[in-house]
């Protein structure tokens, strides 16, 4: 404007000034040729690099869109470019994608058994930025538990990770994810901030019982352990993972009570948890099928978790990422 108060930017895509990509008759950029070369280069990097960040770096160096030009290439281990591509593929069919999910709650019957009922007045938090909405959330199951020939859910098939809360007020969200170890897929999630912390503990306990799952959790906060202990349900919380002791990340002596369960999160452990998540996402889902090039990332159905992975930075609070870290550890 004439006052000079507004700012604007100009984006120059890598396809506009690429070496040897010009129309020889008029000297104009040959955009089609340039795009083909750029996309072929990306394909080579994506499927021939063991570094999940390599494709993100490649896109940032040779951007096709303004969003690619401002991608963060440092400070995160998550395959941001792959995640964004996946979310963009979901976008046009988002309603159909979400329609396969079960939204509801677990209720006790007269025999002390659970049954699932759908709810129409509660909604899961389906966006990473949920500060302006009701943050109570509700259970979202992507795949119902599978039973064996005896009608039982075998112990060990399902595992979980929990990022708990301790106080009834606060900004952090309670988050729990359940994974099917037979299929390597995330099958259930609850993320939210109910009125009372005990409400979140009860939701997680019912979910663990429903899947007969064992959970790793951040034991920095004591409330979850106390709640499970008071109900004689500590067998749904895993002992401190042996791998952390083997890697000298935790002390392995005189562990009892809350100290014997879960994981005491610190910078080193959290960093390793994020690395495990990134490695999971970048692993082919079906390595025995040469025609199936899908990654395990492409079988993740929780959109806000993926949004957290994109936004992750060392200064923020990313509850779903923390819960997933506990799961993979």
Place the predicted regions along the sequence by residue.
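RNase H-like, metal-dependent nuclease domains and their acidic two-metal-ion catalytic environment used
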Residues: 3-6, 12, 21-240, 282-329
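OB-fold/S1-family RNA-binding modules
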Residues: 16-18
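Short, solvent-exposed polar/charged micro-motifs at secondary-structure junctions
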Residues: 20-23, 247-249
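Short alpha-helix plus adjacent loop in nuclease-associated cores
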Residues: 236-287
């Amino acid at each position: 404007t004439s006052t000079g108060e507004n700012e604007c930017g100009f984006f120059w895509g890598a396809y506009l000034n690429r070496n040897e990509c010009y129309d020889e008759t008029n000297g104009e950029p040959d955009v089609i040729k340039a795009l083909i070369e750029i996309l072929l280069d990306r394909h080579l990097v994506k499927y021939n690099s063991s570094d999940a960040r390599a494709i993100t770096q490649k896109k940032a160096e040779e951007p096709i869109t303004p969003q690619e030009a401002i991608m963060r290439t440092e400070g995160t281990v998550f395959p941001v470019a792959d995640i964004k591509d996946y979310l963009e593929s979901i976008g046009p069919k988002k309603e159909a994608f979400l329609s396969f999910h079960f939204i509801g709650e677990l209720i006790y019957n007269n025999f002390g058994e659970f049954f699932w009922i759908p709810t129409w007045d509660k909604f899961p938090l389906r966006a990473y930025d949920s500060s302006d909405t009701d943050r109570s959330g509700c259970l979202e199951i992507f795949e119902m538990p599978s039973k064996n020939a005896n009608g039982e859910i075998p112990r060990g098939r399902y595992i979980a990770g929990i990022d708990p809360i301790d106080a009834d007020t606060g900004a952090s969200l309670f988050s729990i994810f359940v994974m099917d170890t037979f299929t390597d897929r995330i099958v259930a999630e609850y993320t939210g901030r109910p009125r009372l912390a005990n409400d979140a503990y009860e939701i997680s306990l019912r979910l663990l019982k429903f899947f007969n799952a064992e959970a790793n959790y951040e034991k920095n906060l004591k409330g979850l352990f106390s709640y499970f202990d008071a109900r004689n349900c500590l067998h749904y919380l895993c002992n401190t993972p042996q791998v952390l002791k083997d890697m000298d990340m935790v002390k392995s002596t005189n562990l009892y009570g809350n100290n014997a369960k879960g994981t005491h999160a610190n910078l080193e452990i959290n960093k390793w948890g994020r690395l495990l998540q990134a490695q999971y996402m970048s692993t082919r889902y079906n390595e025995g099928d040469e025609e199936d090039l899908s990654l395990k990332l492409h079988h993740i159905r929780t959109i806000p978790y993926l949004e957290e992975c994109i936004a992750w930075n060392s200064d923020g609070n990313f509850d779903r990422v923390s819960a997933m870290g506990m799961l993979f550890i």
